[in-house]
Amino acid sequence: YGGGVIPRFSEVASQFPLSSEFHTLRVQPPPGMHYNTDVLRKMCDIWEEHGSGLIAFHGQSGDIMFQGATTAKVQDAFDAINELGFDLGGAGPAVRTSMSCVGAARCEQSCYDEARAHRQVLNTFVDDIHRPALPYKFKFKFSGCPNDCMNSIQRADMAVIGTWRDNIRTDEALAKKWFAKHGMNELVNDVVSRCPTKAIQIKEIGKLRHDANIS
């Protein structure tokens, strides 16, 4: 199983026989964490039949954690999960399971197709996920914008973050309406000074420059 099964054997099995084996199957989530209720019910049925019934959505690497299987039931559980279209994730010194935000499917902040990038990258490295052969773990995470909902900066070795590459888009009528209500102090303190790249400046109308590359 490579890195996808975390074996756990108890040192007190002679005293507590039911604790003798409690293995975990790490299963890769779909890009964007999209599930329908039919799939979730089937997952629950599989784990009730072959495991303890305890499932964690999701581990810190993004895996669905099917916790509590015996050695004899690991293969049966994997086969049933695999029939649903899911594959084991990674553990140890390998390429780990990845995560991507809901992104282009539902979020207006999305700057690229996160689900497509997630799938293509992970499919490319699937052999390195299943067969640990690296000196240390390696994680990809995909966030569609600098809000970084996947915490890729903190949690990944390769953070893929969508950014805006164009002029700032403004609604002049809305901006004037907002300014009339909030005034100069809020404009400076809550808008201009909060731009990390200092892309916004306040100019007198007579000193404005007009150019195709200036919003």
Positions of PLM-derived features:
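N-terminal basic/disordered segments at the start of proteins
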Residues: 1-39
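Small-residue-enriched alpha-helical segments and adjacent helix-cap loops
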Residues: 23-185, 194, 198, 207-214
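Cys2His2 zinc-finger metal-binding sites
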Residues: 188
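Short, non-ligating residues that shape and space the ligands of small metal-coordination modules
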Residues: 201-202
